[in-house]
Amino acid sequence: MAHQFPALTSEQKKALSETARRIVANGKGILAADESVGTMGNRLQRIKVENTEENRRQFRELLFTVDSSVSQSIGGVILFHETLYQKDGQGKLFRDILKEKGIVVGIKLDQGVAPLAGTNKETTVQGLDGLSERCAQYKKDGADFGKWRAVLKIDNQCPSHLAIQENANTLARYASICQQNGLVPIVEPEVIPDGSHDMEHCQYVTEKVLAAVYKALNDHHVYLEGTLLKPNMVTAGHACTKKYTPEQVAMATVTALHRTVPAAVPGICFLSGGMSEEDATLNLNAINLCPLPKPWKLSFSYGRALQASALAAWGGKAENKKTTQEAFMKRALANSQAAKGQYVHMGSSGSASTQSLFTASYTY
């Protein structure tokens, strides 16, 4: 017999629910700026800029110091540990700059993946040890939500039952610990787009993964109204020769969500998964126009798909500040419109925005 021992007080629930709803209110989404030092190095290398702490700080300062109107498009920003404690040129903490704009500050909490022995190179997530203490410290230091990314792949015998169950339980344990410490957990079970599988196969796997995740969240007494989901869109594998329209992606994606994600979840913020900036926006717009019941806000939590044009415009040069910030604002506004189903594609948007951002076996 299941006995109920309250996991959260009504005050804790109210605070978590309000924060989650605030992040995705009125077409707002999330800027994922939580790339690790190594991942940021790969980005900077492409524009021939050295991967130093100062260069990483300078680029992120450009993103965070844009006009305050960005808060109409961006409801939350996910930071990496380093960035939470960095300051702008005037000595002001980035987290304070964001909060003054009304943007909720989040923090990456997972510590990468580790191999699952006995599987076909599948992984689980590290970072549960000491997580409660880290959450408490981050909350004290201004963070109000967390992010934890689990990775599942479609391949021969993958994802295995073990990988699905292990990652679902780890996500649920993380979510529970977050909520105990006053952080809204972003639950990210990513079915990565590596492979040649078709969209229908991805839909089948995504449904199995999400069903397991919500069973685990229920088992761990996670308060769904105080969470957000960050899933992949349902797309074909990157090497699949068959191409699908945004409308087909939208129908498959919303169908999968409709079958697996409880209506209590306030928002679903899609990851961009290496899509070009423009494709990520077009797919999100089609998802919001999909003629199926959609009880949740359907928004974005994009990293590369919000930053690629801005990074290309910057090129490591301080004099490119204006064009860099304009490029970022343009993508933020486009995705906010898409989150309301109001984006209008205006033909070519420039080479950076239509370039695929796919990286095989992508790690943050």
Curated annotation (Swiss-Prot):
Location of the active site: 188, 230
Binding site for beta-D-fructose 1,6-bisphosphate: 43, 272-274, 304
Family: Belongs to the class I fructose-bisphosphate aldolase family.
The protein, known as: Fructose-bisphosphate aldolase B
Additional free-text comment from the UniProt record: In vertebrates, 3 forms of this ubiquitous glycolytic enzyme are found, aldolase A in muscle, aldolase B in liver and aldolase C in brain.
Subcellular location, record wording: Cytoplasm, Cytosol; Cytoplasm, Cytoskeleton, Microtubule organizing center, Centrosome, Centriolar satellite
Function comment: Catalyzes the aldol cleavage of fructose 1,6-biphosphate to form two triosephosphates dihydroxyacetone phosphate and D-glyceraldehyde 3-phosphate in glycolysis as well as the reverse stereospecific aldol addition reaction in gluconeogenesis. In fructolysis, metabolizes fructose 1-phosphate derived from the phosphorylation of dietary fructose by fructokinase into dihydroxyacetone phosphate and D-glyceraldehyde.
PTM-bearing positions, type Phosphoserine: 36, 132, 272, 276, 299, 301, 309
